[in-house]
């Protein structure tokens, strides 16, 4: 794509170019370290850095143009410069244009919410595949082409930057995908990482307090997540979430779901939690049928209803949904059972890292635990929502018999400060059934070693993440492998 064509795609005035400067643009990035020959470099003014400071570095790496919101007084660009109203929006729009708008060639389902979006994304992908649609997936765990092989992005985020999103969607199309499911975080929606994606279906799970360090207020957090519903042609809405009332009627079409409310379009009846998983009756526009889902946790009924509603909108039948649920094997790091021997406690790895999700996880495991319930839990450092640290300590000590408080990506926040806050949440309620062990590996060892057969140990917060971030280092991490190593020593 020529630079003049890119300007036209962004609805910008034609740049002053000649045959030499109207060069071919082959990619776009906002990171000068990622520039390849032929790239357009988007200079974004952020809280800490101004991308315009890296224009010469981008030029040296082979960039052919710069896009930005305007040069400062006295500043010049070493490359042709396109002035845009919003640099992040331009990054996304340019990425979509250069990739040929791949989402227009796919049926795209977006899933957002504080909790439940990863399980719902994986389940929706599985249901669509069970219905015969070659389906890709882009989620916090990684991304999949229709071949089912899980690939990972080399970063610690839920949704990659806009160029990676568009390139991945193009890769899916090239691999024969007919549909894809994309997990959309509030950061991705706020920072325009998923701008330029053509959404067929938006799935809303629920909203609770998280990432307020970034969004400032819960209302702002909601407003960013709401963007997905505003941009979709069809919405799948959870009527058990109070925020849903503000989402009704926004999308051209919608349906509702609930594990509790019998007035929802998609609803569950006669829910049973068995050793083999969940059994319930589905009442829906697709018909009424008996469902079996081999997953732990009553809350997964709502995730299943959301996935079924989305898949049905894209053509899945009741029989296909029923078969798809029965064959679903869950998500790595989401209520994942770590294999152990007959004399070992049951060890579960789960991503639960907010007070509501931790409460759900512990409540679920309590119902099927004959002995004591243990939890290993930390809270993220940096500026990331310090307000949930004390509530996490309160929930952990209220619902578990033994709580081990530890690290979880403390970054540049002193670990002891985080532990003190979590301990405060427990002590203010008069509880002392906890111990603080700063090193997460040692915390896991302590819990798994001290737990007895019949006990359950929940390793909460990390799930499938493959790094552990500390102030001065980032360690490779595998929570399941850590648990297996301790179980093997018993």
From Swiss-Prot:
Binding-site list for UDP-N-acetyl-alpha-D-muramoyl-L-alanyl-D-glutamate: 158-159, 185, 193
EC number of the protein: 6.3.2.-
Pfam families (UniProt xref): Mur_ligase, Mur_ligase_C, Mur_ligase_M
A GO term from the CC aspect: cytoplasm
Entry keywords, A to Z: ATP-binding, Cell cycle, Cell division, Cell shape, Cell wall biogenesis/degradation, Cytoplasm, Ligase, Nucleotide-binding, Peptidoglycan synthesis
Biological process according to GO: cell division; cell wall organization; peptidoglycan biosynthetic process; regulation of cell shape
Gene3D superfamilies: Mur ligase, C-terminal domain (3.90.190.20), Mur-like, catalytic domain (3.40.1190.10), MurE/MurF, N-terminal domain (3.40.1390.10)
Subcellular location: Cytoplasm
Residues involved in ATP binding: 113-119
Molecular-function annotations in GO: acid-amino acid ligase activity; ATP binding; magnesium ion binding
Modification after translation (UniProt): Carboxylation is probably crucial for Mg(2+) binding and, consequently, for the gamma-phosphate positioning of ATP.
Function of the protein: Catalyzes the addition of an amino acid to the nucleotide precursor UDP-N-acetylmuramoyl-L-alanyl-D-glutamate (UMAG) in the biosynthesis of bacterial cell-wall peptidoglycan.
Family: Belongs to the MurCDEF family. MurE subfamily.
Protein name stated in the entry: UDP-N-acetylmuramyl-tripeptide synthetase
Organism field: Deinococcus radiodurans (strain ATCC 13939 / DSM 20539 / JCM 16871 / CCUG 27074 / LMG 4051 / NBRC 15346 / NCIMB 9279 / VKM B-1422 / R1)
Gene designation per UniProt: murE
